[in-house]
A protein has these predicted regions:
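A glycine-rich (often HGG/GG-containing) alpha/beta subdomain
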Residues: 1-152, 156, 160, 336
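C-terminal-of-GTPase-core extension/linker across diverse P-loop GTPases
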Residues: 2-13, 17, 151-270, 287, ...
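Beta-strand-turn-beta hairpins that frame and shape the catalytic cleft
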Residues: 68, 271-276
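Short glycine-/small-residue-rich Rossmann-like dinucleotide-binding loops
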Residues: 247, 282-283, 307, 314, ...
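Noncatalytic alpha-helical scaffolds and linker/capping helices
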Residues: 274-277, 282-286, 291-294
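Loop/turn-to-beta-strand initiation segments
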Residues: 274-276, 307-308, 334-336
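Inter-motif core of Ras-like GTPase G domains
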Residues: 292-316
Length: 465
């Protein structure tokens, strides 16, 4: 773990770069008040930042080393432990011009603070016990949330809903360990069989709880990162029109000329609370245009990566050579086949298409001209994400790979523990497996995680958070 010293005072700009109404500079550390006092001067000359009352807003001016006024600003001191990092924190709110915010940052650096690493404020909150590791990761999930459902899930994690489940399971595991170790330490009481029976019942219960949590991973991941959705079809089948319809804006150029979309477009859409990362691919066909060829190759690769495939076929015409290429590409896959242009006379032999296209596909008819079938498509997407097993963004979700892997490993140790009990092996061997499960669950909250993993997690944060 990177170690810059526990008494370091750090500073960073906490608002996005560029122009805005307000810019926020955040300072954290034992000497944050001293650093801020050297550049923030309030109207009362005998009042300095280190003497501010905690959580009170004070008006003043930013001055440089020569006494020149840089800007008018507000300053808020939040003294330890009642702050985000549980350290002394000072936030300066200036006008949001890029130059003035950068100048205030430079003054803080000149007066004893150092530049914060990415995520270092939240990392300090974790190290100081303000948040556990799962809650810390949810901070970035809140920042990146694209739908209300995503935000509710992230906010629930920040409040500790997910962590509480993990901690409860770890507590139950400790009870099992205590009973088993008691039977080891006090063999004269002849409680070995009772301890094993109790351990077996509790371990099965915990294992089932982990299995339930893992069943939410796909939904949680999608709410966090978005459902990668590839729109596939031949040129001029209506892919860009569908993209614009789902986005509810004209993002993609729509013409009657095949090959208008020569590269893939990526956009996010909110479909019933589900964030869709929609990829409008180039129409798949043979072409002499090198740029379009690259686009077609990318389209084919997106079919392999996508969480959901929307395959478009034009009902107003017979299957073409380009359609045949789409059919071959999609063999054995699953997704939704959209029969487009159903506002026109149907020429396509749909039964023939269903026979040719082998895979798990739901067939739906749509028209982007009159929006026929669009609501049904959106509901189908939502149903696929939630699978009818959970209420939308309610309860606890596993939403990242690190958490899922730790749960899977803990589950494996619990399975080994049950096998050890069934083989009637000594309690010492049972304790080894169940303690390993306890440690794996601790990696989720950060109680037993390696320092390198902590560094890697917080390096993904933005500077200033």
């Amino acid at each position: 773990m990177k170690n810059f010293g526990e008494n370091d005072t750090i500073v960073a700009i906490s608002t996005p770069p560029g122009e805005g109404g307000i810019g926020i500079i955040r300072i954290s550390g034992e000497n944050s008040g001293i650093v801020a006092s050297k550049l923030f001067k309030c109207a009362k000359k005998d009042l300095t930042v280190e003497n501010f009352e905690s959580h009170k807003v004070v008006y003043g001016k930013i001055v440089d080393e020569k006494g020149n006024v840089i800007d008018e600003a507000l300053c808020i001191a939040m003294w330890a432990p009642n702050s985000y990092t549980k350290e002394n924190v000072v936030e300066i709110q200036s006008h949001g011009g890029a130059l003035v915010v950068r100048r205030i940052l430079e003054l803080a650096l000149q007066n004893g603070a150092r530049m914060a690493e990415p995520g270092e404020f939240t990392k300090r909150a974790f190290l100081n016990g303000r948040l556990d590791l799962s809650q810390a990761q949810s901070v970035m999930d809140i920042i990146k949330a694209r739908t209300d459902a995503s935000l509710r899930m992230a906010a629930g994690h920040l409040q500790g809903k997910f962590s509480d489940e993990i901690k409860a399971m770890r507590h139950d595991i400790l009870e099992v360990i205590a009973h088993l170790e008691a039977s080891i330490d006090f063999p004269e009481y002849d409680i070995e069989d009772v301890a094993k029976d109790e351990a077996s019942a509790k371990v099965r219960s915990i294992k089932n709880r982990i299995e339930e949590m893992l069943s939410t991973f796909n939904t949680g991941r999608i709410l966090r990162d978005g459902l990668v959705t590839a729109i596939i079809g031949k040129p001029n089948v209506g892919k860009s029109s569908l993209l614009n319809t789902l986005l509810r804006e004209d993002r993609a150029i729509v013409t009657d000329i095949p090959g208008t979309t020569r590269d893939s477009l990526e956009e996010y859409a909110n479909i019933g609370g589900v964030p869709l990362k929609i990829i409008d691919t180039a129409g798949i066909r043979e072409t002499e245009d090198k740029v379009e060829q690259i686009g077609v190759e990318k389209s084919m690769s997106y079919v392999q990566k996508a969480d959901l495939i929307l395959a478009l076929f034009d009902t107003s015409s017979d299957l073409t050579k380009e359609d045949e290429e789409i059919i071959n590409l999609l063999q054995g896959k699953e997704g939704i086949v959209l029969l487009t242009k159903n506002d026109l006379s149907c020429v396509l032999d749909i039964e023939d298409l269903q026979k040719r296209l082998q895979g798990n596909f739901k067939y739906m008819q749509i028209s982007t001209f009159n929006n026929d079938g669009i609501k049904e498509l959106e509901q189908e997407i939502v149903n696929r994400v939630y699978s009818g097993t959970v209420k939308q963004a309610e309860g606890v979700f596993v939403n990242n790979v690190r958490q899922a892997n730790a749960l899977k490993e803990a589950q494996k140790y619990l399975e080994d523990c049950l096998n050890t009990i069934e083989m009637d092996m000594a309690e010492d061997f049972i304790v080894i497996d169940i303690r390993s499960a306890w440690e794996k669950l601790g990696e989720i909250t950060g109680d037993t995680v390696d320092e390198d993993i902590i560094d890697q997690i917080f390096s993904q944060f933005c500077i200033g958070k």
